[in-house]
């Protein structure tokens, strides 16, 4: 396979070498969503004090290999938090029509915006900023993605008893494209509100597509973290990790299986690198960025997620003497990368595109392994994966 790196001075520059990526991934642990019964008493046969607890899904993968690095895993971690599109209920689309409880409407809108949307198929891995940056979700004329479904919840409850009454997800009506569905586990419902006698609560809420960068209610991962095994917490010192082993754990918010989530993250990263490469190609061709042994490249619209990834790979290129990243304003998504070449190299233009290509190949390699691991789970008879790509 031959890859076009960039077009410079009217000439296409090709990369004929296919990088041999030394990264291995194996499944360390996979927990699917399930329910367990617990008891406050030692006597488990006494069901008066028994209760059921939901256990969230969780996936732990072991990354290793000569080419593995913290920044590779950390980029996946940041992307699953901030960049994968999901559905959520923004407070603008939670309309409370009747509420005489002790909980005011602002509190309830904030609480209801945290209600998760579970097992909802979505065939996209990125969402154009026109659909979420500075968008007024209450505006019926707002731009909508063609894949966006109509997801609504209606709640209309009244406590006609003499006791406090818990209102849970068992008491709501959930609709997807006009069809009422049962999305929540009836054994372990989520608490919505508690009503005292003669209290009423009535509302409707509508979900929209967004990303975690706008608000964490759209984060596709509830938790994502890694252990790089380079520190000894007991001795408070550093230890060797010759095979660059990293255990990466992801807990889904519930819309996607963890494997699907990570595959989408790889697709997103490759797309972003394509966008960055195309933008740089235009700026080099138009002389906006002039050829020099010492370059400063500004990546508007990017933060440390893609900036630090590119900076790390540039630092590892043999023709780059040094590369550094800065974010001048932490409230503005724009990063600067300063690159200096080795003495015998006139410009870092070619190394930049070589490393963009190498990063793309790295995440395509990771995606390929994730697909294989995902397919193994699909083949298991007790697999509980419900989300498709």
Spans of features found by a protein language model:
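Protein-protein interaction/assembly regions in multi-subunit complexes
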Residues: 2-389
